[in-house]
A protein has these predicted regions:
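Sequence signature of WD/YWTD-type beta-propeller architectures
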Residues: 1-178
């Protein structure tokens, strides 16, 4: 069996898919015939999401971090880094890495979920706020600017807080940004 992932729709109506580690596209104008685009540089990708412009997609690799692939440039880079191995205390590390990336409608930002360090989000493990779960995924938003973000760095500005600024946003499902 093949591993098939739906990546998303381009602005011109092309549906992009990955079949194992090959990038495929289909469109109504081509009678929905699958067309090979190129071989992807990784075989451990999941949670793929395409930007609205149809030029880039973000995904999670087996290393539990977010990566970006530029289709036109045929290039890729690691978007996030954090400690995911050797977990001894859920309040210290991003135990599950980063998940479920999604682009803003203009492609300038990437939103995803992650499990922030206790020191970065002081209320993240307050049972009165988030219940008794050991780990809480938070909404994280970063610029799509070609840089790798170290999510273990203090005050890196990636955790999204609502206007009242008291508690971060808990996010457990795929993000859809319209």
């Amino acid at each position: 069996p093949h591993r098939i992932n739906i990546i998303g729709w381009s602005s011109v109506g092309e549906l992009f898919l990955s079949v194992d580690n090959e990038l495929i596209k289909a469109s109504e104008s081509n009678n929905w015939r699958m067309t090979y685009v190129k071989k992807l540089p990784f075989d451990d990708i999941e949670m793929l999401n395409m930007n609205p412009q149809g030029t880039q997609f973000v995904f999670r690799r087996g290393d539990k971090h977010i990566w970006l692939y530029d289709i036109q440039e045929d290039s890729h880079y690691q978007v996030t880094t954090s400690k995911v191995d050797g977990i001894t205390d859920a309040r210290t590390y991003y135990s599950g890495g980063e998940r479920l990336p999604s682009f803003s409608p203009d492609g300038k930002y990437i939103a995803f979920t992650g499990q922030p360090r206790h020191s970065a989000v002081p209320y993240a493990y307050d049972p009165a706020v988030f219940g008794t779960a050991a780990v809480v995924n938070m909404l994280i938003i970063i610029e799509n600017n070609g840089k790798t973000r170290d999510l273990d760095a203090d005050n890196d500005g990636t955790i999204f807080y609502p206007k009242d600024g008291k508690y971060p946003i808990s996010a457990e499902q795929r993000l859809i940004w319209r």
